[in-house]
């Protein structure tokens, strides 16, 4: 198997559900053990990490932890952002996130596909 392009990358995952973060960490670290993986369960913690560290990609829970505010911060830092969705987004939420430059969405029931999903996010020019 080819080495993942995620190896060596710095990833921040933000979700108010610790179980989701645990699954993300297991999936990502299994698929690319040489990447750096940080987590945050609140807006404040995520904002502090975004201010103090550099990341290659940020995974955000769009509806929790003030996801739209964090999306705005990440986009202003020119970071690649992947949005997690627990349910189908309302047309209003989808439109708002798209207008804010979110381009990649993954349903939480597909977390087992996170590594190839993030590889696509990193290699696609939105």
Which residue ranges define each predicted feature?
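Acidic, metal-coordinating helix/loop segments flanking the phosphotransfer/catalytic sites
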Residues: 4, 18, 25, 39-57, ...
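Conserved acidic segment of CheY-like receiver
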Residues: 7-19, 24-28
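Alpha-helical interaction/dimerization surfaces of two-component signaling modules
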Residues: 26-31, 49, 96
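Conserved phosphotransfer cores of two-component systems
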Residues: 51-53, 73-80, 100
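Conserved phosphotransfer microenvironments
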Residues: 58-73
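Alpha4 helix (beta4-alpha4-beta5 surface) of REC/receiver domains from two-component response regulators
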Residues: 69, 76, 88-107
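Hydrophobic/aromatic residues positioned on beta-strands within the core alpha/beta folds
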Residues: 84-86
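C-terminal output helix
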Residues: 91-93, 109-121
